[in-house]
């Protein structure tokens, strides 16, 4: 499920989005104030955002009970700091942080309001919690950690003779580094040579991809926000070179990568929404509520990409969700 910019705006209006800056915790109509921050717009994060709101609604927190302040940093770290300061001043009842950078920004600024995170690979490594099983902070939520090893293995299912794995990810995202390290360790165990490229912004993706042509047999991209927002740029280089791309997020496969074994980000958002409702109901506290694993994983294959690359879909993926 993809939440477009227009849909996000409509959702904000539907839920009574407002910029209360007076430090009041609730609006005058008694609704709970929910603040949502998303690092940038791309399919997986948009789906998590919509899922979060739907999860709240399922637990009784619909438009009649909550006022939602939706903020999107558009990939700019300085915007995240401004948004965090806004939330600190407005003091909402609960904050939802979508992505690791968004969660780090609000958690660094705010220590006394509950924060529910989603689309975050590892809360503990990102220093959002003391441990994933016992946070001891004002942050908890749902991680988006998929099975990196099996995601890499997808490449070998399509290309059994492959010897060279390409890795491309953002140098500024700790979530991506975690997964890249896992991928490199797994590649070493399989005897694969790894060619690694990092980017600092979407402007670096084309050059990084071009430098891999002729050097790799297939590429793996983790759940990286920078790359996820520009998959068409990546496959514009890799498709003509007949280099398949396997990814950590469902939206990346929908946008042109060949395949993914991924968290369902919409359902993960719903799961986070349920946790948020439990916080609002006083049933749980963030500091003693373990970070949850995603409940749903799915295999996604882009049929158009497979056809473009001239690759047959392996038998074990015949029942996968087909897109493209």
Where are these regions (language model features)?
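Sec-dependent bacterial lipoprotein signal peptides
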Residues: 1-15
